Amino acid sequence: MPPTPKPPRLGYVEKREWEQMEKSILVAERYLTACQESAADPRVAADHKAVRARLETLAAAQAKVDELYARWASLEAKVKA
């Protein structure tokens, strides 16, 4: 009977990344909240260029948070394997 393959484990770099992931997500979420508040600022509502820039920054911040959660899930799956 062939040996069963070992489940993937975290390497050194991935382990350190996983250990710091919660902090990274919290920082990214704080930045996302700040971007949301900035985009909702009524003082810039009349300036379409400023609104567009803030919305682009907001979209990038949301993408970063989503990316971090996806990476965390990937690392978590390896840890639990």
Where are these regions (language model features)?
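Charged, heptad-repeat coiled-coil alpha-helices that serve as long linker/dimerization "arms"
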Residues: 1-81
